[in-house]
Amino acid sequence: MPEPSRRIPYRTWPGALAVLLAIAAYVGGLSFWDSRTPGSRPLAAGETVSVGHARFVPASGWEMDVSRSRAGQSLMLFKGGHKFLVTTRAWAGGPDGPLMRQQRLMERGQRLNIDGDVSDFVTSWGLQGKTFAYYGSKLAGRFWQVVDLQRRSLVQIDCYGASEGLNEAMADARSMLESMDLEAPQ
């Protein structure tokens, strides 16, 4: 019987080492980039910020959370343990649909309690909508919603945080809401 041919062994360690170095450089580079990229951005006093077609002037001391903000869709501001979230989206229905959905999400999904009834609000700029307060074991907040039927758009504003210092955060939130209008160019 003929003897089987002997295969010349391939050197696999250089290729494996190159793959390992490429993975290490990729992961290390991403970790380096992540550690050098700030997660928040301070906002200049009096600077108007826009999200979608909504624009407002942030209260002093609030910073933008870069990782939770999406250009043209949402803007998250924070100050201490309190958050101020503005989201905009297209909406072709009536004003009650998204508000009821948000209440259900808070009550059933997040186990929060709605405090009182939904009420109407009007700002000095003429911005009007609906609002309600909510609370849970660790946080409390207020939710505002504006539906612009002509533009077919929805703006939702949510301010929440720990009960400690909430009155000051709500005063800041009301001042930001008072400065808001829906005339930002898109």
Describe each PLM feature range.
Residues 61-64, 70-71, 89-94, 146-151:
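A short, sequence-level motif marking secondary-structure junctions
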